[in-house]
From Swiss-Prot:
One of its GO terms (molecular function) is NAD binding. Keywords: Cell inner membrane, Cell membrane, Membrane, NAD, NADP, Plastoquinone, Quinone, Translocase, Transport. This is NAD(P)H-quinone oxidoreductase subunit H 2. NDH-1 can be composed of about 15 different subunits; different subcomplexes with different compositions have been identified which probably have different functions. It comes from the Bacteria. The keyword Transit peptide does not apply. NDH-1 shuttles electrons from an unknown electron donor, via FMN and iron-sulfur (Fe-S) centers, to quinones in the respiratory and/or the photosynthetic chain. The immediate electron acceptor for the enzyme in this species is believed to be plastoquinone. Couples the redox reaction to proton translocation, and thus conserves the redox energy in a proton gradient. Cyanobacterial NDH-1 also plays a role in inorganic carbon-concentration. It is a peripheral membrane protein. SUPFAM superfamilies: HydB/Nqo4-like. InterPro entries: NADH_Q_OxRdtase_suD, NADH_UbQ_OxRdtase_49kDa_CS, NDH1_su_D/H, NiFe-Hase_large. One of its GO terms (cellular component) is plasma membrane. It is found in: Cell inner membrane. It catalyses: a plastoquinone + NADH + (n+1) H(+)(in) = a plastoquinol + NAD(+) + n H(+)(out); a plastoquinone + NADPH + (n+1) H(+)(in) = a plastoquinol + NADP(+) + n H(+)(out).
Length: 394
């Protein structure tokens, strides 16, 4: 009698570090049993540039251009905690107009990030059309960034200790209002095309499940945490900038799978549009052209020249010293909690500069949620986390 022997050896597969589906220079050492993933070990560091050590050898002004090289999909969001930490340590006050401008820029960056997530996420599953649609809308946001800061994607260098670099230019507020009229309709278009598509839903429902307890225990943040049923948003928790003065809701879901993470990001884009609309309407002094007209009409002693109507309180000098002490500043970035831990020594440079990026923490759970999935689903689960390797490796 002839017997057929089958080999049951496990196979080790190297994915990356330059595979397009890894969204950067990420290497995954995947152990497979047939088509099932048994183990996955991320290998990091291919894009490590020593951002923390650079921060310890630069003044705040010198270091700000480096920040946009962390998460370059939402570059301006990296600047917020970098200036918030010295402001809190030195007791620097920020004018209300500057705070409103910051919030507008942060929420525009959030929408730009989520648009750039939706397109490649669908592309990982073989759907090419949405990728071209999101570039169309993202272009409108990048045009606004270019008008206000001079640059589109990275190196905006717009936030400053005490405010922002320059005021919003002539006609910018009207263009931002036009954008807020366009984006909701485009999100509706995405939802008609994607959300209830039966092929899309069968592909990602119940895939990459993370329970509420696991999300908390692994220290997840952002859409990864809120998609597992945890209503935690630093904009509500920490009450920073002027978010408390605006009416908006936390985007969350209880599914815990890849579909829930997609739904949360779609909801977040809608909430960001609500925030931007209100911030534009309530902007102290109104559009730049109206504010300047009031100042000219009422003279140098006009109330429109008071502190709250400035784009920066007091320009920090190149020799601005970080006071002795330590502080942890954090903000709700598009991917989660971005934190900066600073130890000052009454010097122009910090003694310790620690960066806590959200996608580095969120990536840690990948090996756990991949166990038992098919190898074909690996890139989909990875894509649902939303990582940028410049931010992960720093």
């Amino acid at each position: 009698m002839v017997t057929i022997e089958t080999r049951a050896d496990q196979m080790v597969l190297n994915l990356g570090p330059h595979h397009p589906s890894t969204h950067g220079v990420l290497r995954l050492i995947v152990t497979l049993d047939g088509e099932n993933v048994v183990d996955c070990r991320p290998v990091l560091g291919y894009l490590h540039r020593g951002m923390e050590k650079i921060g310890e050898n630069r003044t705040i002004i010198q270091y700000l251009p480096y920040c946009s090289r962390w998460d370059y999909a939402a570059a301006m969001m990296n600047e917020a905690p970098v200036v918030n930490a010295p402001e809190a340590m030195a007791g620097v006050k920020v004018p209300r107009r500057a705070s409103y401008i910051r919030v507008i820029m942060l929420e525009l960056s959030r929408i730009a990030n989520h648009l750039l997530w939706v397109g490649p996420f669908l592309l990982d599953m073989g759907a090419q059309s949405p990728f071209f649609y999101i570039l169309r809308e993202r272009e409108l946001i990048l045009d606004l960034f270019e008008a206000a800061t001079g640059l589109r994607m990275v190196g905006n260098n717009y936030f400053r200790v005490g405010g922002v670099t320059v005021d919003l230019p002539y006609g910018w507020v009207d263009k931002a209002h036009d954008l807020c009229d366009v984006i909701p309709g485009k999100i509706d278009e995405y939802e008609r095309l994607i959300t209830n598509n039966p092929i899309f839903r069968r592909r990602i429902e119940n895939l990459g499940y993370i329970s509420r307890e696991d999300a908390i225990n692994w220290g997840l943040s952002g859409p990864m945490l809120r998609a597992s049923g945890v209503k935690w948003d630093l904009r509500k928790v920490d009450h920073y900038e002027i978010y408390d003065e605006l009416d908006w809701d936390i985007a969350w879901d209880t599914g815990g799978d890849c579909l829930a993470r997609y739904i949360v990001r779609i909801k977040e884009m809608r909430e960001s549009v609500k925030i931007i609309r209100q911030a534009l309407d309530q902007l102290p002094g109104g559009p730049y052209e109206q504010l300047e007209a009031r100042r000219l009409a009422e003279g140098p002693k006009s109330e429109w020249n008071s502190f709250d109507y400035q784009f920066i309180g007091k320009k920090s000098s190149p020799t601005f010293k970080i006071p002795t002490g330590e502080y942890y500043a954090r903000s709700e970035e598009a991917k989660g909690e971005l934190g900066i831990y600073v130890v000052g020594r009454d010097d122009t440079t910090p003694w310790r500069w620690k960066i806590r990026t959200p996608d580095f923490a969120n990536l840690a759970i990948l090996p756990m949620i991949l166990q038992g999935t098919k190898v074909a689903d690996l890139v989909v689960v990875l894509g649902s986390i939303d990582i940028i390797m410049g931010s992960v490796d720093r």
